[in-house]
Amino acid sequence: MSRFTYAYMMMTRLETLKNNLQAAFGQDLALTESLGELTLEVAAEQWFSACTKLRTDPALRFESCIDLCGVDYLTWGNGTQPEEKTGPVTHGRYAVVVHLLSIEHNWRLRVRTWAPDDEFPMVSSLLECWPGVNWFEREAFDLYGIVFEGHPDLRRILTDYGFIGHPFRKDFPLSGTVEMRYDPEQKRVIYQPVTIDPREITPRVVREGSYGMGR
């Protein structure tokens, strides 16, 4: 099979998926395409029902959820330089994203929803739709503080017992808030406030005065 033939087949499959999504969601469809990938935007109140339709509709059949993750858009659009600023995101601060795979039809889809409340981000759990997202949702809760309504065991899964905060949030301090050390008097590991002093390191470059001359 030539490279051109393969690319044509992929584009044809992508167009078929677009048409099937249009037929399934009608006027509610919010679809974007970039780099040969499709992203479906879903309102938070339709999150569970839309994902259920993606799994059960014979024309879609996304029977496998490859990944679920949280995203914090707090600094989205700021850029590393002032001239790179593109403006803040127009939706909420927190999003939940799933990557789906249809083994039957051999196509993929990214689906994203936005938590409506930045202070208490919450969306419906997809555990009844794809049981494999159990620990994915616990991870997003642990790292971002996103609550998945209906999850039967929404506990932290990566951070330590008694951890305060959510370390993947953009406003969480890079050095953390506490550190661990062994206390010889208590003969156990204890927590204490972070003792790292924040500092900015500027590299120093030293060159000879004639560096680069005559080249």
From Swiss-Prot:
Phylogenetic classification of the source organism: Bacteria, Pseudomonadati, Pseudomonadota, Betaproteobacteria, Burkholderiales
NCBIfam families assigned to the protein according to its UniProt record, in alphabetical order: NuoC_fam, PRK06074.1-1
Family note: Belongs to the complex I 30 kDa subunit family.
Molecular function via GO: NADH dehydrogenase (ubiquinone) activity; NADH:ubiquinone reductase (non-electrogenic) activity; quinone binding
PANTHER family, per the entry: NADH DEHYDROGENASE [UBIQUINONE] IRON-SULFUR PROTEIN 3, MITOCHONDRIAL (PTHR10884:SF14), NADH DEHYDROGENASE UBIQUINONE IRON-SULFUR PROTEIN 3 (PTHR10884)
Keywords: Cell inner membrane, Cell membrane, Membrane, NAD, Quinone, Translocase, Transport, Ubiquinone
Membrane-topology annotation of the record: Peripheral membrane protein
Sections of the chain in a coiled coil: none
Database matches in Pfam families: Complex1_30kDa
Name by which UniProt lists this protein: NADH-quinone oxidoreductase subunit C
HAMAP family hit by this protein: NDH1_NuoC
Function: NDH-1 shuttles electrons from NADH, via FMN and iron-sulfur (Fe-S) centers, to quinones in the respiratory chain. The immediate electron acceptor for the enzyme in this species is believed to be ubiquinone. Couples the redox reaction to proton translocation (for every two electrons transferred, four hydrogen ions are translocated across the cytoplasmic membrane), and thus conserves the redox energy in a proton gradient.
Enzyme class: translocase
Gene that specifies this protein: nuoC
Membrane-spanning parts: none
Enzyme Commission number(s) of this protein: 7.1.1.-
Location relative to the cell: Cell inner membrane
Organism: Bordetella parapertussis (strain 12822 / ATCC BAA-587 / NCTC 13253)
Assigned GO CC terms: plasma membrane
Catalytic activity: a quinone + NADH + 5 H(+)(in) = a quinol + NAD(+) + 4 H(+)(out)
Subunit architecture: NDH-1 is composed of 14 different subunits. Subunits NuoB, C, D, E, F, and G constitute the peripheral sector of the complex.
